[in-house]
């Protein structure tokens, strides 16, 4: 049995989960998420708990079992609490600012880099070297944060670049002169 798949998901107050065939709809105070799952995996809602089960123990069903449960749990947590990723800009002259609904990054290129947040994701800039990506869909929040980080990933010699808050960047020695 999958260690993740066999855990039940507790539905918090204010969140409703409905099943229509293999499509799950999760509604909560932060928003609504709809996802279609593999029809071979069985999802049962009993009271305020969700159980996920698989038909056989073959490799494909074992993999889908844990994945289905994890995605459902992320949907429930997302619409009730939401997700956020914090990014830091480290480097001389590196700064971020919000212009309307766009995030504008000045990170050492000849031009500013602009990002527009997708529906359900919002970007905050509390300081000019800090960016917070918030939303109820974990996948969209993580993808936008990764795309922002990919503009200027941290380099190992000086540590300059965009990194996640608390991310450890492994540093390297520079070349030594003769």
Curated annotation (Swiss-Prot):
It holds the Pfam family Ribosomal_L6. GO terms for biological process: cytoplasmic translation. GO terms for molecular function: rRNA binding; structural constituent of ribosome. The keyword Ribosomal protein applies. GO terms for cellular component: cytosolic large ribosomal subunit. InterPro entries: Ribosomal_uL6-like, Ribosomal_uL6-like_a/b-dom_sf, Ribosomal_uL6_a/b-dom, Ribosomal_uL6_bac-type, Ribosomal_uL6_CS. It comes from the Bacteria. The keyword Cytoplasm does not apply. Keywords: Ribonucleoprotein, Ribosomal protein, RNA-binding, rRNA-binding. Belongs to the universal ribosomal protein uL6 family. Part of the 50S ribosomal subunit. This protein binds to the 23S rRNA, and is important in its secondary structure. It is located near the subunit interface in the base of the L7/L12 stalk, and near the tRNA binding site of the peptidyltransferase center. HAMAP family: Ribosomal_uL6_B. This is Large ribosomal subunit protein uL6. It comes from Listeria welshimeri serovar 6b (strain ATCC 35897 / DSM 20650 / CCUG 15529 / CIP 8149 / NCTC 11857 / SLCC 5334 / V8). The lineage of its organism: Bacteria, Bacillati, Bacillota, Bacilli, Bacillales. The gene is rplF.
